[in-house]
C-alpha cells in the first residue's frame, strides 16, 4: 500500500483528526450557546452530526496516537476499508447537516430578514456554527479521499 500524506497512522493523519475534533466541538459549542437553537430541526441535526463526527474523529485520533507511539502499521486492507466507510458516512452526514443548517440561516438572514427585526435572535452564532461545520466537512473530505486512495492502491 502507498503511504499517503494524511493517511491512518501518520502524523499528518493525526493532525487532520485533531482538526476535525476541534472544529466539530467548536461548532457544537457555538450552536449550543445560541438560545432557541432546539426550535429548528436542522440545528439539532447539526449538533447530532457534529457529535458523531467528534466521536469518530476522536476514536481515530486515539488510534493514530497508538500507532505512532507503538510504530504500528494501520494501513492494512481491512482497517482501511473500515476507515473509508466510516469517513464517507460521516462526511455525507456532516455535509447534509451543514447545508441544511446553512439553508435555515440564509432563510432567516437574507430572505425573511428575521435577524434584522429581532435583535435578540443569535443569528451570528448560527452563522459561526455553520461555518465551523463546513470547516469540519472539508477536513473529513480530505481524510476520506486519502483513505479511499490508499484502499484503491491495494
Curated annotation (Swiss-Prot):
It is found in: Cell membrane. Residues 1-10, 64-77, 151-154 are cytoplasmic. InterPro entries: CASP_dom (IPR006702), CASPL-5 (IPR045009). The keyword Transmembrane helix applies. GO terms for cellular component: plasma membrane. Belongs to the Casparian strip membrane proteins (CASP) family. Its main location: membrane. The keyword Transport does not apply. It is a multi-pass membrane protein. The lineage of its organism: Eukaryota, Viridiplantae, Streptophyta, Embryophyta, Tracheophyta. It comes from Arabidopsis thaliana (Mouse-ear cress). Homodimer and heterodimers. This is CASP-like protein 5B2.
